[in-house]
Design a protein with these regions (language model features):
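N-terminal strand-loop element at the rim of the active site
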Residues: 4-10, 22-61, 222-227
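A charged, aromatic-enriched C-terminal amphipathic alpha-helix characteristic of glycosyltransferases
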Residues: 11, 304-369
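Nucleotide-sugar donor phosphate/pyrophosphate-binding loop at the beta->alpha transition
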Residues: 64-66, 103-105, 110-136, 171
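A short, active-site helix/loop in glycosyltransferases that binds the activated sugar's phosphate group
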Residues: 134-161
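Short His-centered aromatic/hydrophobic patch
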Residues: 84-90, 108-109
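Conserved donor-binding/catalytic core segment of Leloir-type glycosyltransferases
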Residues: 173, 177-210, 340
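Boundary detector for helix-to-coil junctions that initiate low-complexity/charged tails
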Residues: 361-457
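Nucleotide-activated donor-binding/catalytic signature segment of Leloir-type glycosyltransferases, i.e.
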Residues: 228-247
Length: 457
């Protein structure tokens, strides 16, 4: 069973579908547990796939009913092995795997380090639960060495628990024989804060390229919470472009463009399509991928490399002056490296004899689970207390609202009313979550377990 948060746009989503396609070719029966999104229809077309539309719990809660639902799915379909791809799935899927004694594979898709503390801020997982997740995994798959080392050091696990498998490309899907048109430029990115400077770097490079090539046209694929900011940047730079939003037909769009701007997976897909691939970077603009630097970029999942910063104008001139023979050499050499090192058929974690897989859950001590549960309750109590404090903050804002409203115009009044409604809704949601936990049958089971074992802990 493949567990993924939501079938929307993104590199992890594409990586999952690439993995699922390869498992399908190898004859596996695959169950996909993910919330519906525009990749769902494409997923349903893959042979041997049973798609289960499953909205996971809110990041701000631990939902015991979701745990029971995942447990029932595992038992109903006789699931033998679970692949967990995103942190959003962990609270319910890990718990269900422990209850059913089902082994699982944990994926570390982080292309950057330093994300684990951010995960703890979501509210549905404390440090002990986070540690348990990686400790109980049969294998941890990391996409690069830096991510593996960070995980290993943070959770104090042995190196043999890990395997590095980079995100790879399905060359049966991404291929092209059409000529390269250097007048057509494509920028691909999610519009989210974690992408940092990637989009603005791409826009600034195109601005320089347009000065040299008046025929250059820019198309942008992507969407997200920072869309308005991106649109403001486009307007500020006075760039004319076609914004297509989030799309699931990236291969066809790449076919129509000769230069691809982006990072990570989209850079690899551009190489597979034999296009000029330019890495925009998360921090600094990185420039063209060639046979001289492709291996260095591969170590960072085709993102920023040390001392890799390039000037926009310099790279724009480099691309503008490319001759046909130079273009052919670049794309052919890049393709050769990628096909050898990033082909999905050679880079997938397959367990041929699942019955013999190492399952640390078998060795999990019952009292250890209880200790972690108590720790999680303390964590949730602290987190909920913060929500209550925010509720008091909302009350204060309410008082300020009524005391100050006579001085406000209609626009400010409307903004304050919306802000107040958001605070009240969030506070009520927190109270509802606490009430759901209190009234659940799992809570009754937990109280009985704690009562029977409190003297043993």
């Amino acid at each position: 069973m493949i567990c993924h948060a939501r079938l929307t746009a993104g590199g992890i989503e594409t990586a999952c579908i690439t993995q699922i396609r390869e498992f399908s070719r190898r004859g596996y029966k695959i169950y996909v547990l993910a919330e519906n999104g525009f990749y769902a229809e494409k997923l349903k077309q893959i042979k041997g796939v049973t798609y289960i539309d499953f909205p996971y719990e809110s990041r701000a809660s631990y939902n015991l009913q979701k745990v029971e639902q995942v447990k029932e799915i595992i038992e109903k379909y006789n699931i033998k092995l679970v692949y967990i791809h995103q942190i959003d799935c962990v609270a319910s899927v890990l718990s269900a795997c422990i209850l059913t004694n089902t082994p699982y594979i944990a994926y570390v898709h982080h292309g950057i380090t330093g994300v684990y503390d951010d995960e703890l801020q979501m509210g549905n997982m404390g440090r002990n639960f986070q540690t348990l997740y990686y400790k109980m995994a049969s294998k941890i798959i990391a996409i690069q060495e830096a991510s593996k080392k960070e995980n290993m050091e943070r959770f104090k696990l042995e190196e043999n628990k890990y395997k590095i498998i980079p995100n790879c490309v399905d060359f049966l899907e991404f291929n092209s024989k059409s000529p390269i048109n250097l007048n057509k430029v494509l920028l691909i990115s999610r519009f989210e804060k974690d992408k940092k400077n990637g989009v603005i770097n791409g826009l600034r490079w195109f601005l320089e390229y347009k000065k040299l090539n008046s025929k250059a046209e820019l198309t942008i694929v992507g969407d997200g919470s920072q869309r308005q900011k991106v649109e403001e940047q486009i307007k500020e730079l006075k760039i004319e472009c076609h914004m297509l939003g989030a799309r699931n037909d990236i291969r066809d769009i790449m076919e129509q463009n000769g230069i691809i701007l982006g990072i990570a997976r989209c850079a690899q897909e551009a190489i597979a399509m034999k296009r000029i691939a330019i890495i925009t970077g998360n921090e600094d603009f990185q420039g063209i991928i060639t046979d001289d630097n492709i291996e260095k970029f591969s170590y960072t999942n085709f993102q920023d490399i040390k001392n890799g910063k390039k000037e926009y104008a310099e790279v724009a001139k480099q691309v503008y002056l490319l001759k046909n023979k130079d273009i052919g050499k670049i794309v052919d050499k890049n393709y050769e490296w990628l096909y050898t090192n990033r082909n999905i058929k050679d880079n997938i974690y397959e367990v041929e004899d699942i019955e013999k897989i190492n399952n640390p859950i078998n060795e999990l001590d019952r009292n250890e689970i209880l200790r972690i549960l108590i720790g999680e309750l303390q964590y949730m109590h602290t987190w909920m207390q913060k929500e209550i404090d925010r509720g008091w903050g909302a009350r204060q804002k309410t008082e300020d609202y009524y005391l100050g409203r006579e001085k406000w115009n209609n626009k400010v009044l409307k903004e304050k009313e919306q802000e107040l409604e958001q605070y009240i809704a969030k506070y009520n949601n927190a109270l509802n979550e606490l009430e759901n936990i209190k009234n659940s049958k799992f809570w009754e089971i937990y109280k009985k377990l704690f009562k029977n074992n409190k003297n043993k802990i």
